[in-house]
């Protein structure tokens, strides 16, 4: 369970089943615990079918829990319908009324609640200014680009300042450049509003860029909750290590521990070295090494570094960096990202060349589990 100060949302032991067309029960949420702080940007991340959208829909009220508790601002919400929850949702499809002006789209909820005309005009204008759409109240949705329509959908969702904003893959239909711009705008908007955002995405870059905390789900279970850097650098298990970012996940077993350094032998054919804190001789592990943590030359004291040997299979230019695929003597594949390589260094990256890759001992992250 994650613990947030001053939680706006608390989910306790949430369970949700679905029935397949064949009549089989599928557990979409399996005992999920989560809390979201009042000013947090929390992202639900995981593969298709992991439960992230189901979890979002239970918070919004579009799905009900089979068991467990849901509290928003300390009030039990299990029996409260969606329209009575202090929550708004922004979807991938903008769901704007095409026959209404932008101002009327944004102010629709205020009209339903009977807000006075002068106050409505002020709040609609303020919401549109916040999303960079001020002065466009009289336009119709069909006159706007996709990015502008997304901003209008956001303005509509925040016009009455909900306690919580839910975002269900709202940027996935935008092109890459616009999506990156909207990521920055969303994060700035969340800070300015001072309300909690719960964001669903399948895009890891979005999650790592925007979130205060990330919730990684798989098979209806929470695998890990943490800050983006913790999730990336210190994954809790092999699933998170393999799912988040590019990774080399090497199976190994601790052979010896001496002078604060553990030596492991694994399927990659070379001895692996890493700090021995918390490790025991004979212990099976997965060792995580990110591709960008390798160096062509030892950058410091060799005693503080480990090395992997292999033969270059492929080198691919990816902008200013080179992605190198290495195969060890035992057949294991290692992926490395080489940065700022000199012309002389590039000669060592030709396919068929023998290559030694260096890494700092503390860059290797051990993960408990059968090797």
What are these regions (language model features)?
Residues 82-242:
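ABC ATPase nucleotide-binding domains
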Residues 32-43, 97:
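Pre-Walker A (P-loop) beta-loop-beta motif of ABC nucleotide-binding domains
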Residues 247, 257-371:
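Non-catalytic connector elements of ABC transporters
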Residues 45-47:
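The feature captures the beta-strand-to-loop junction immediately N-terminal to the Walker
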Residues 60:
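Helix-to-loop junction immediately C-terminal to a conserved catalytic motif
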């Amino acid at each position: 369970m994650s613990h947030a100060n001053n939680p706006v949302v608390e989910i306790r032991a949430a369970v949700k089943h679905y029935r397949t067309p064949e009549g089989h029960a599928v557990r979409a949420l399996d005992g999920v615990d989560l809390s979201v702080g009042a000013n947090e940007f929390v992202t639900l991340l995981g593969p298709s079918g992991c439960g992230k959208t189901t979890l979002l829909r239970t918070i919004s009220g579009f799905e009900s829990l089979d068991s467990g508790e849901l509290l928003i601002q300390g009030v039990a919400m299990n029996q409260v319908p969606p329209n009575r929850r202090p929550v708004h949702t922004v979807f991938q499809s903008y769901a704007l009324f095409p026959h209404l002006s932008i101002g009327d789209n944004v102010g629709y909820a205020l009209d339903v609640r009977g807000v006075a005309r002068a106050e409505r005009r002020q709040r609609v204008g303020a919401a549109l200014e916040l999303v960079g759409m001020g002065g466009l109240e009289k336009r119709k949705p069909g006159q706007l680009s996709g990015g502008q329509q997304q901003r209008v959908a956001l303005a509509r969702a925040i016009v009455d300042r909900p306690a919580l904003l839910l975002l269900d893959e709202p940027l996935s239909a935008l092109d890459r450049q616009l999506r990156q711009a909207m990521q920055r705008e969303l994060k700035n908007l969340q800070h300015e509003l001072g309300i909690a955002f719960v964001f669903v995405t399948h895009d890891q870059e979005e999650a790592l860029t925007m979130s205060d905390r990330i919730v990684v789900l798989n098979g209806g279970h929470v695998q890990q909750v943490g800050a983006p850097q913790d999730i990336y650098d210190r994954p809790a298990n092999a699933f998170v290590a393999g799912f988040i970012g590019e990774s080399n996940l090497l199976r190994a077993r601790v052979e010896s521990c001496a002078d604060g350094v553990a030596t492991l032998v694994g399927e990659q054919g070379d001895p692996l070295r890493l700090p021995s804190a918390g490790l025991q001789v004979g212990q099976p592990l997965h060792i995580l090494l990110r591709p960008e943590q390798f160096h062509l030359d030892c950058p410091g004291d060799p005693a503080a570094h480990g090395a992997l040997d292999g033969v270059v299979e492929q080198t691919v230019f990816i902008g200013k960096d080179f992605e190198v695929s290495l195969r060890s003597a035992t057949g294991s594949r290692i992926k490395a990202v080489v940065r700022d390589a000199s012309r002389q260094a590039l000669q060592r990256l030709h396919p068929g060349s023998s290559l030694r890759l260096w890494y700092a001992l503390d860059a290797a992250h051990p993960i408990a589990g059968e090797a």
